Amino acid sequence: MLSPEKFQRDTFAALNNPQLRRNFKRAMSGLMEKRQAVFPDAEEWQQLRELGSLIRANALRKLPELLEQLEANCTANGIQVHWAETVDEANKLVLEIAQRHKVKSVVKGKSMVSEEMELNHFLGQHGIEALEADLGEYIIQVDHELPSHIIMPAIHKNKEQISQMFHEKVDPETLAESAEEMTAIARKVLRKKFYEADMGVSGVNFAVAETGTLCLVENEGNGRFCTTLPPVHVAVMGIEKVLQRLDDVPPLLSLLTRSATGQAITTYFNMITSPRKSVEKDGPLEVHLILLDNGRSRMHSDELLRDTLLCIRCGACMNHCPVYTRIGGHAYSATYPGPIGKILTPQIKSLHEAGHLADASSLCGACVEVCPVKIPITDILLRLRHDKADNKRNIPITESGVLKAKIESLIWKCWGMVYANPILYQLKSYKLSKVGNYMPEWLPLLRNWTSVRSKPRFAKKSLHQLAREEGLIDE
């Protein structure tokens, strides 16, 4: 559940968890160093991200026609295309496909859209077991947690914590000491599930309208298992993932892998264009593609907010964010944490439910500097902050203006009057110098500040007075 109060509580808990802080510092430092190592040439980096931004912007500019082209070419290739306006519709589509084929177990590759849909929980409610096949996702599923990072879901855990968890919940006879041993434990469980699964579910990194091709980027091979071994493959994707041409994929793939994990290229890159053909010996008999909107069309209608949809889900903004790297992903209580989550979640949910996330930023701009597709994250954050209190314009965000507080508006109006009038300003300064330091910390206007910071002390003399006494001002 999203709320400002829960976010504050979870933030305090994270900041007071030394082990979590150490885990994130180690992981984030390593990711930043690896990314820097694969982008040694600043000029090449700027040229590549300019190209990536243009490719994504071009696709968004032509989004309606490209989606129609994607549907037509996928259908011609034998892929069954479905449209879902909401996560409820998307979940029902997956369930209908599963029930039609009497599916009892599902294996899932990495997919942020399926997390957005809360698909595992939904299928479980209808008696269908959904097992995560990505190692990081499997770890947090076994431990009944949510992902804390969009690329590395279990990054908040260290090796010892994962080993102990596997010992307690997966293989009581083994206490693994190395990453290889832990991987072997997971592989032993997952391999059996791959062969038993009735349906595989995957995400989509890029969908090529020109050819009707679905592209999946991965490192572990689980995505390939999920999309080839079960007789039915269901791919779920946000409508913004479409690209115009096959030639658009290589630049974005290069940006994605290097920005995400510091790799020149991932271990596996899957391109799916059709179900199994009659002359082929393996592959799914049916492939379904579910195109999810869930507020994306609303974002697309606004010139600035549309840039949110440029995202290729590399996670670089998170790795460099001074807020995320200190509190982790769970504090956000959202599918998408970090800088991209702060601008995406309020638009997917509503400003009333998630608008507070836009305030959790210092606006330092580190996320903007490392974004491979040049999303103006800080500009969008400021826009969302403004829209929380502005209900006078035609704003394409759910419940805009809902957080406007009358008392806050009155305070800012008074502040403006004081700072616009020299006499009132001097009177305010004089009064604060006399009584300001005696104000109790429990006052409503001070409490939020003093709960985490020292109360500011007011000087007895203003800077103007001191300068005049020193003869620095010629009256």
Give the ranges of each region predicted by the language model.
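The feature marks the mature, well-folded catalytic cores of soluble enzymes
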Residues: 1-304
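Intrinsic disorder at enzyme termini
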Residues: 4-31, 407-475
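Predominant activation on well-ordered alpha-helical scaffold segments within soluble catalytic domains
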Residues: 71, 120, 247-250, 315, ...
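Residue-level detector of anion-binding/catalytic polar loops
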Residues: 80, 129, 317, 367, ...
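Short coil/turn segments at secondary-structure boundaries
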Residues: 136, 265-268, 396-398, 406, ...
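Ferredoxin-type iron-sulfur electron-transfer modules in oxidoreductases and energy-metabolism complexes
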Residues: 279-308, 324-441
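Conserved, hydrophobic alpha-helical core segments of structured domains
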Residues: 309-316
